[in-house]
Amino acid sequence: GAGEAPLKENLAAAILMRAGWPEVARRGGGLIDPMTGSGTLPMEAALMASDSAPSLFREYFGFLNWNGHRAEIWERLLKEAGERKSAGMKKLPPIVGYDSDSRGVKNAVVSLERVGLKGFIHFERREFASCVPHPKMKDVPGLVVLNPPYGERLGELRELRPLYANIGRRLKEHFRGWRASLFTGNV
């Protein structure tokens, strides 16, 4: 939701690896993040599934000024990485991010352009209670991955119990056969 710290890209990538996303994507299964916030999980999922090299869109690396740096090799590697990403983007499974907060969705959409993913991920304002597989995801079970809000204090934990129960119900009722991965500070 709004005001929460966004998930770091490396942590999002680790969550997706642990959840089995690369295998789900290879099978053609899609990804839904029903509490997407700033959209980090769907964006990392797209980069991973498209075989994009980490930091491919970055323009500067410290080694570029190193005396031993060989620009021709670096340029060739960048070209190869760009070609692999282009080929991977053509085979990208459906990836969707939903959030109840319209500001988060707007920020996620803006971020898509920054990382070269505009048009490849669908973000939309939607309450968790109405999350179902996207119409493009009917054929192959995918992955639901979410980072729900979590409480630090005991009172907050009690307030979250209904949310976590609702998550379980929603997954059982509407995502049969799908994988699910929840990242939370609560056990």
Label every model-predicted segment:
Residues 1-2:
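Non-catalytic substrate-recognition/targeting regions of SAM-dependent transferases
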Residues 7-10, 14-131:
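Conserved S-adenosyl-L-methionine
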Residues 28, 141, 175-179:
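Short glycine-dipeptide loop
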Residues 90-94, 98-111, 152-187:
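Conserved Class I SAM-dependent methyltransferase catalytic core
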Residues 130-145:
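A short acidic, Gly/Pro-enriched loop at the edge of an enzyme's catalytic core
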Residues 145-152:
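A short SAM/SAH-binding and catalytic strip from SAM-dependent methyltransferases
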